[in-house]
Amino acid sequence: DQQLLAGLGIASAVLQTIVGLMVFLAYSTTPAVARRFGAGEHTGAVRAGIDGLWLALALGTVLAVVGSLTTPWLVSLFGADAAVSEQAVIYLQLSMWGLPAMLIVFAATGLLRGMQDTVTPLWIAGLGFGLNALLNWLFIYGFGWGIAGSAAGTVVAQWAMVGAYAFVVGQLARRHEASVLPQREGLRGSARAGWWLFLRTVSLRIALLATVGVATGIGTGE
C-alpha cells in the first residue's frame, strides 16, 4: 500500500546515501590494484585489494551499528507521518546489517577489476540479484513478513555475495602468496585515494535527500 511504498522510499534514500558515499571503495581499490598488477607485482596487487576489503569491513561495521541505533532519528528527519515512519524504520534497521556486506562487495569488485577480471563480478552480481529476488518472494509472500521480509532477503543475498567473493579472493591470495591480514599503511592509502570522490558524492546526495524531504512533506495523499 501507500504507507509501505513511502516507507520503503525513505529507507532506500538513506541506504543509497550511505552506500553512495562509500562507492570510493570500488573506485580507489581498482587503480591501486591495477597499478601493481600492470607492473608485474601480482602479490602486491592482491595485497592492496585485501586492504580495501578490510577497510570496507571496518567502515561497514561502524555504519551498521551507528545506523541501527539512530534509525528512528534518521527517519524522523523526513517528517513523514507515523504509519510511514514505522515502515521505514522496520526496513532500515534490518537493512543496516547488510551494509558491511555491500561495502565488501564494492571493494572485492575493485580488486578483481584491477586484476583484469570483469567476468567474475558479473556472475556474482547476477546470481546475487537472482537470489535476492527469490528470497524476497519467499520472505514476503511465503512467510508473510511484509516489508521486513524484503529487507531480510536483501541482507541474506548480500552476505551470500560476500561468501562468493571471499572464496575467489582466498584463491587469489593463495595463488600469489599474499597475506590476508590487514596492513595499516594499505588501509590509509585506500582511505586517502577515495577522499575526493567521497566529497563529490556528499554534494550529490545532499541534493537528492533535499528532494526526497520535500516529496515526503507533500504526503501520500497527493
Question: What do these predicted ranges mean?
Answer:
Residues Q2-A13, A88-L92, I147, A151, ...:
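Small-residue hotspots at the loop-to-helix junctions and early N-terminal turns
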Residues V33-P100, L134, I140-W195:
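Short alpha-helical transmembrane segments in multi-pass integral membrane proteins
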Residues L94, V105, G128, A157-M161, ...:
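Transmembrane helical elements of multi-pass membrane transporters/channels
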Residues T17-L21, S95-W97, W123-G126, F198-V202:
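Hydrophobic alpha-helical transmembrane segments of multi-pass membrane proteins
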Residues L25-A26, V66-T70, P100, I104, ...:
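Residue-level signal for transmembrane alpha-helical positions in Major Facilitator Superfamily
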Residues L5-V65, M102-P121, V212, T216:
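Small-residue-rich hydrophobic transmembrane alpha-helices
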Residues V65, W73, A107-L111, G130-L138, ...:
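Alpha-helical transmembrane segments of multipass membrane proteins
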Residues D1-A6, V75-A82, L138-W145, R205-E222:
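Helix-terminus/linker motif at the lipid-water interface of multi-pass membrane proteins
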